[in-house]
A protein has these predicted regions:
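Conserved catalytic motifs of ABC-family nucleotide-binding domains
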Residues: 151
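Conserved ABC ATPase "signature" region
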Residues: 99, 103-126
Length: 245
């Protein structure tokens, strides 16, 4: 079976508030799908359920055809996540960070995997540097290496280039493009960077009020809504108080 992650009739409620309401989508092997929406629309809750960290009120998440709620331990070893809001242990070196994380996942040939990712992400010269002394761009690349240390088949990215300078952001995007081509991986990219989404994603999910209100390729969405670019489509989504379709 090819690698994939599928969300089926997924909902999450907190008391009387419905944070995510009956959403459906699938990310196939070797595909990056973008998730766009304003703050508070349900993106983070969706990612939490996809990772098995939040229990859905209704629906299910299938990873490679298996329900994550019923196969959580085995499936989480095939998944990983990156967010700029999760800090690295400041007193550990880069190498120590990768070793600790690799051992959590029981990674075979851990040293070889560290060497591979360090080369790809230009970490070789800072492997023995303490993480707390790194620049934001260096920390971002270390976080990405940690997220790939277990060679995941599913990768969930929450604002992976937030707060990065243009050069470092472009390096990370180029790395993700190449990594996807070289590895059989399904990727969800939640981002507010429209150029990033258009460059990396084969399709885009537009989310508002906990609902997927539209989806399609970036070019399809631009044409459908008669806009000049994806940013204008996003602004239409945010500003339109009525149904967006």
């Amino acid at each position: 079976m090819s690698n994939s992650i599928e969300v089926i009739n997924l909902s999450k409620s907190y008391k009387s508030k419905r944070a995510v309401n009956n959403i459906n989508f699938k990310i196939n092997e070797n595909e990056i799908v973008g998730l766009l929406g304003p703050n508070g629309c349900g993106k983070t809750t969706t990612i939490g359920m996809m990772l098995g960290l939040l229990k859905p009120t209704n629906g299910q998440v299938l990873v490679n055809g298996l329900d994550i709620e019923k196969n959580k331990i085995s499936l989480l070893h095939k998944m990983n996540f990156i967010s700029p809001y999760i800090e690295l242990p400041k007193k550990l070196t880069v190498r120590q960070n990768l070793i600790v994380y690799g051992k959590l996942y029981n990674v075979d040939n851990l040293n070889e995997q560290i060497d591979y990712l360090s080369s790809k992400l230009r970490l070789n010269k800072i492997l023995d540097n303490v993480t707390g002394e790194l620049s934001s761009g260096q920390k971002n690349r270390v976080s990405l290496a940690k997220a790939l240390i277990n060679n995941p088949t599913v990768l969930l990215l929450d604002e992976p280039t937030a707060s990065l300078d243009p050069e470092t952001g472009d390096f990370v995007r180029t790395f993700l493009e190449n990594y996807k081509k070289e590895n059989k991986i399904s990727v969800l990219l939640a981002s507010h960077n429209m150029d990033e989404v258009k460059r990396l994603c084969s399709s885009v999910l537009m989310m508002k009020g906990g609902v997927i209100v539209d989806s399609g390729t970036p070019d399809h969405l631009i044409r459908k809504h008669g806009r000049r670019n994806l940013e204008e489509v996003f602004l239409e989504l945010v500003r339109n108080k009525n149904e967006f379709n």
